[in-house]
């Protein structure tokens, strides 16, 4: 409401100013566009908007007030206020003017030219200076500079502002003359005032706090500097804003870099504080102790290097054993060969990726020939070792070079557990352990289960375990977090089923197949155990492997 009152007062003042020869409209833009009243009387409103009023304006108090009032009037129009309501409010505000003649003139202007003014406000909301130029409250910047140059030409006196600009470069070089910069920085610098040093440290500390706690501080700081540029006067303010736009990004980067630096150090570099001669050395703490303090639930690696099998081979082994067990169940039920392959394909679909893909590869490669092998009641786990997807038993190494009956006999024997060689003692590994290659999840599985074991109570429900799984990865160090998220996304259903019963890291991770056996014995070189992909290459290999009938029925048909 106060803005409208001020707006009406400015209208009265502007539109009652005299115009040279108002009866004629042949005086050019200087006369036509002097104010809105003359432009309306001569029908030159559009011409003045395009050619005169849209030009940059000089800075002045009436112009700034007018721009503010025009902006407020535009906001009032956005609030869906009708023209009659605005007219009524403006007429009421005209009555508040103490000068009776100005009050009457205000009402006359409001009644006569309000529609034209409101149309201009609606059309030029982004440039309120155009409306204020029409009201003769803002002066063209070009006209203002021309008047200043004319005044300077009419007088022989050198303006004071020019003298200051001439002297400024010489004054700025005086500190360099008094304190040459060629000396090494190790020499003591002039003592700075303690009060100035304290003020600098407080300012830097406040800025650092604002940068850390207020995300909009940087943009607000730049906007505040631009507002200060407006106080420098016409011409110079535009140059100031140009410098701000050009160098503000560099200043922001410096502020972000200094947010973790000590205020005293920054003020020393700026010359407001005395240079610190000595800085006490921080006490070094072993990395293992630092990590334990940050993550109490995270245990370090064992003091010896584990020779782990890649998780890629573990997935193949677990998939093969799953397929073989399903195959045995189907054979017991006297299923046909077509149903066997179809049933195995359906079983593969139940596995998570990438085990699903590997399972389909096993079925596609060995499925048609598995029936012949299972006739001899071969152990599924042993067969997976023969075809190279699981660790082979020692007694199979020699048998693989023998004919097929010898291979079957070796497969039917009970497996004997291999002796584990003693682990050589080595120095402790560093605290930072990179993730395994090929997407291995063994280490991250152990650390995640260990975290759950330390932070969950016994007999925890599935919901509690699931909640702990979803946030547990965020407590691991950075090298493990992404790998942990992938691990949980892939093994979450299987993990839940096992963790409800037991939370031993070694058992759980071995149970789901991400931590394989540390040793894998080499297989023999007998190619006939490679399966149909080798048997059915040609008639010669099929005959040598006694698989001619199989290749004719399943591959060559």
Swiss-Prot record:
Positions of glycan attachment: 80, 214, 334, 459
S-S bridge residues: 63-138, 66-132, 94-106, 197-273, 200-267, 229-240, 317-390, 320-384, 348-359, 442-515, 445-509, 473-484
Location(s) in or outside the cell: Lysosome
UniProt xrefs under SMART domains: SAPA (SM00162), SapB (SM00741)
Keyword set includes rRNA-binding: no
Positions annotated as propeptide: 17-59, 143-193, 277-312, 393-437, 520-557
GO cellular component: aggresome; cytoplasm; extracellular region; extracellular space; late endosome; lysosome; membrane; mitochondrion
Keyword terms: Disulfide bond, Glycoprotein, Lysosome, Repeat, Secreted, Signal
A Pfam family per the record: SapB_1
Function: Saposin-A and saposin-C stimulate the hydrolysis of glucosylceramide by beta-glucosylceramidase (EC 3.2.1.45) and galactosylceramide by beta-galactosylceramidase (EC 3.2.1.46). Saposin-C apparently acts by combining with the enzyme and acidic lipid to form an activated complex, rather than by solubilizing the substrate.
Name of the protein in question: Prosaposin
Species annotation: Mus musculus (Mouse)
Lineage per the UniProt record: Eukaryota, Metazoa, Chordata, Craniata, Vertebrata
